[in-house]
């Protein structure tokens, strides 16, 4: 009876290793496809993966084949029209097909390659090369980052990570184990043959039998493969959580009457993207949500994204509340403080200079990074004009403009592109 042993470690995902190698090989094309996809779908729609399209030309492999010219020697079935060594003229152009459709005037081609990536793969590509700017590693407490480290060996992987020494050690151990009993038996038979050859009288038949058994055993030992897939070992790498400085992100959103529903929706999408980025890359980071119209209020996540409350516009109320919360709960000596403010830029005229003053004197000296996102299809408003001077003077202040939903992801990547961490 024959037994089949499945040594694959991937279970149902039998091509997981090949899949990861494919994702690494065509990373730039896949990232471009994901960037295009985020413009078509809702930012909050991350429960499913994404269909990724790669142009066929990008995955084509070099191919050696015979050219269209030259002289070839071939053997064809014989018939009554040709005899050996006849020269057959090559047909010019392609042959006619048997289909009934009309011919087109374009060149033939192949469809682009389309495949599905999972939710985790989608988010990994979405947030790759992004990080909190100016993160200072000065107080090891709650925030956890993940870094790649060597983690021993694994039985599957890519050829580039193969460990030759460990694989040969496993091969030697396996061959020794599989042939140990046969070698002991071979040693006994060789001793018997040696004793028989020195004994009287000579027994030729027994000598022949022992030599045949010895030869059979040697062949069986030689058939043990030198290397087997079960011997292969690959250097393993894993992402380990590493403690680093604790951080807090302040999310300030304008919900005044000047913010129409479409503008509020774009602001929510930006903050949802920010929330996904923080929760996926930083395990224990704290997030403070502040909504404001004429008055500012600290709210929870549910109320921040879904409350219908609205009113007039006094942006400074949110900045004052943020300043109060920082001084009450988040010591800048122990916390990395970040803020993201989203607004349509429409503010009470006398309040915009006060906002600039609050940022300059109270908030920017305390925060690692402050970003302002103005969401409007109109010309820039008073708040933008007041903030422009800050962006030129302060390295930890950034401004971006969102006009359409398609701008959300490019603006997000621009604001949170990975930088060298401060020490």
UniProtKB/Swiss-Prot annotation:
Q: Where is this region: Disordered?
A: 40-111
Biased composition regions of type Basic and acidic residues, renumbered to the chain:
77-90
**Which Pfam family is an annotated match for this chain, by its short name?**
DUF444
Highest taxon above the source species = Bacteria
Here the segments flagged for biased composition (Gly residues) are: 92-107
Listed PANTHER family: UPF0229 PROTEIN YEAH
The Swiss-Prot or TrEMBL record describes its family as follows:
Belongs to the UPF0229 family.
The record's listing under NCBIfam families reads: PRK05325.1-2, PRK05325.1-3
Name of the protein in question: UPF0229 protein NT01EI_1636
Species of the source: Edwardsiella ictaluri (strain 93-146)
């Amino acid at each position: 009876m024959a037994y089949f042993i499945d040594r694959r470690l991937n279970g149902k995902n039998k091509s997981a290793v090949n899949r990861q190698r494919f994702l690494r090989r065509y990373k730039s094309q896949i990232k471009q496809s994901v960037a295009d996809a985020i413009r078509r779908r809702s930012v909050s729609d991350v429960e499913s993966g994404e269909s990724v399209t790669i142009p066929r030309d990008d995955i084509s492999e070099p191919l050696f084949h015979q050219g269209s010219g030259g002289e070839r020697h071939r053997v064809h079935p014989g018939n009554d029209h040709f005899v050996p060594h006849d020269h057959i003229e090559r047909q010019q152009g392609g042959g006619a097909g048997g289909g009934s459709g009309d011919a087109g005037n374009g060149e033939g081609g192949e469809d682009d390659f389309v495949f599905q990536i999972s939710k985790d793969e989608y988010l990994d590509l979405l947030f790759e090369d992004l990080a909190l700017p100016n993160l200072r590693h000065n107080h090891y407490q709650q925030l956890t980052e993940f870094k790649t480290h060597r983690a021993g060996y694994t039985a599957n992987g890519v050829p580039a990570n193969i460990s030759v020494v460990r694989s040969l050690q496993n091969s030697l151990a396996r061959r020794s184990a599989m042939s140990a009993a046969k070698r002991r038996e071979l040693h006994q038979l060789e001793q018997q043959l040696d004793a028989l050859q020195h004994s009287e009288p000579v027994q030729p038949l027994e000598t022949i039998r022992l030599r045949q058994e010895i030869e059979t055993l040697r062949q069986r030992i030689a058939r043990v493969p030198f290397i087997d897939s079960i011997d292969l070992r690959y250097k393993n790498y894993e992402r380990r959580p590493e403690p680093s400085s604790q951080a807090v992100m302040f999310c300030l959103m304008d919900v005044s009457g000047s913010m129409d529903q479409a503008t509020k929706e774009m602001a929510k999408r930006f903050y949802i993207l920010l929330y996904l980025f923080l929760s996926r890359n930083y395990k224990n980071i704290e997030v403070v949500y502040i909504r404001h119209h004429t008055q500012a209020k600290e709210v929870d996540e549910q109320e921040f994204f879904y409350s219908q409350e609205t009113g007039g516009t006094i942006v400074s109320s949110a900045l004052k509340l943020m300043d109060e919360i920082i001084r009450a709960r988040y010591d800048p000596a122990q916390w990395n403080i970040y803020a993201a403010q989203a607004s349509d830029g429409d503010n009470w005229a006398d309040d915009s200079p006060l906002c600039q003053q609050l940022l300059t004197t109270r908030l920017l000296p305390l925060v690692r990074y402050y970003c302002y996102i103005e969401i409007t299809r109109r010309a820039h408003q008073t708040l933008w004009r007041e903030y422009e001077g800050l962006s030129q003077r302060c390295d930890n202040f950034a401004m971006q403009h969102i006009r359409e939903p398609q701008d959300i992801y490019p603006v997000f990547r621009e604001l949170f592109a990975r930088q060298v961490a401060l020490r």
